[in-house]
Design a protein with these regions (language model features):
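Short beta-rich binding modules
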Residues: 1-186
Length: 186
């Protein structure tokens, strides 16, 4: 027998269960992967390996980036001006410096991801606003509910494709030049 020493971690009480959480953004940073721009966003009370990685995504119709900009919009970060263009869809001008996200509150959706090493928590790429009223942008309980429901729907759609992007599915479909005409025998 021997006398041993062990260090007991105190834990920080962070909640890793699946579901919506209102968090405060600690910091954020832009980077690139395979020529694709993304932003990593970290949160107070969570370690450095628990972040949201959000890739730049452009709307095919309007040609406007929306995935990263929603993080600024929903947290009311860097908002410079909101212009009513008469269409019922205001135009928001914002400063996309990641430092503007620091200290801002936002709702994030945690989900569980299965790997060969086990299951771990991740943060979904689409946030939802918190209830707030400002001179630039305001969000009601109804707005928050709408954006949460929309993010959940998009998450479930992504999950049902087993994590594959629409573009990868389209690529596979377009590479099949001679699809079989007969029914599959089994």
């Amino acid at each position: 027998m021997a006398i041993r020493t062990v260090t007991i971690g105190s834990g920080n009480g962070a909640d890793y269960e699946a579901g919506w959480k209102e968090l405060t953004i600690k910091n954020a940073k832009y980077d690139h992967y395979n020529s694709n721009k993304f932003i990593d966003i970290w949160f107070e009370e969570y370690p450095g390996n628990m972040n949201a990685r959000v890739y730049e995504t452009v709307n095919k119709t309007t040609k406007e980036e929306f995935r990263i900009s929603n993080w600024f919009r929903f947290s009311n970060s860097g908002i410079q001006e909101v212009i009513d263009n008469g269409s019922g869809h205001p135009v928001v001008t914002y400063d996309d410096d990641p430092v503007n996200l620091e200290g801002m509150k936002i709702h994030v959706l945690f989900y569980r991801k299965q790997t060969e090493d086990g299951e771990y928590a991740r943060i979904w790429r689409e946030p939802a606003p918190v209830i707030m009223e400002t001179d630039k942008l305001s969000y009601t309980e109804k707005d928050v509910s709408y954006w949460k429901t929309r993010a959940e729907r998009n998450f479930n759609s992504w999950k049902s494709r087993d994590g594959e992007s629409v573009s990868s599915i389209e690529t596979v479909a377009s590479t099949i030049t001679d699809p079989p005409k007969d029914k599959v025998p089994f």
